[in-house]
UniProtKB/Swiss-Prot annotation:
This is D-aminoacyl-tRNA deacylase. It comes from Cupriavidus metallidurans (strain ATCC 43123 / DSM 2839 / NBRC 102507 / CH34) (Ralstonia metallidurans). Homodimer. It is an enzyme of class 3 (hydrolase). One of its GO terms (cellular component) is cytoplasm. A motif (Gly-cisPro motif, important for rejection of L-amino acids) lies at residues 142-143.
Length: 156
């Protein structure tokens, strides 16, 4: 399972002109399930994402996670957006192949599991809409962007 995370000062996702999720300072996580992923990969990825230290401490070092982004126990927002294109195979030709991505029904199940677990573990979780054409706007803080991946069990 893959997450492209971006530290943001604000982010919003809309579908058909309707805002489905919006956060202030925190993380925007574009999330993708790969073939062979299970709930175990989703949970490992979420644990890594929530504890990944990308916010600055008092000395200006990236040393704080989204769950304690100000160093005083205050959590930042988490906006989770499904994006199957993260699994694209771009190794040959000029058109991406999405064969590595999970089938839509598996992707939805794993995305829903990821979001459910995120809401249980983090106080401020917003989402996009799985499978919808979305418009995502953000102000990247830094910019700070990281690629996190927990490989499918068969490829681990």
């Amino acid at each position: 399972m893959i997450a492209l995370i971006q530290r943001v000062s604000q982010a919003r996702v809309t579908v058909d002109g309707r805002t489905t999720g919006e956060i202030g300072a925190g993380l925007l996580a574009l999330v993708c399930a790969e073939r062979g992923d299970t709930e175990a990969q989703a949970e490992r990825l979420l644990a890594k994402l929530l504890s990944y230290r990308v916010f600055s401490d008092a000395e200006g070092r990236m040393n704080l996670p989204v769950q304690n982004m100000d160093g005083q126990g205050n959590a930042g927002g988490l906006l989770v957006v499904s994006q199957f294109t993260l699994a694209a195979d771009t190794n040959s030709g000029t058109r991406p192949s999405f064969t590595p991505a999970a089938a839509p029904e598996d992707g939805r199940r794993l995305y829903d599991h990821f979001v459910t677990r995120a809401r249980a573990a983090h106080p401020s979780v917003q989402t996009g809409e799985f499978g919808a054409m979305m418009q995502v706007s953000l102000t990247n803080d830094g910019p700070v962007t990281f690629w996190l991946r927990v490989p499918p069990a068969a490829n681990a």
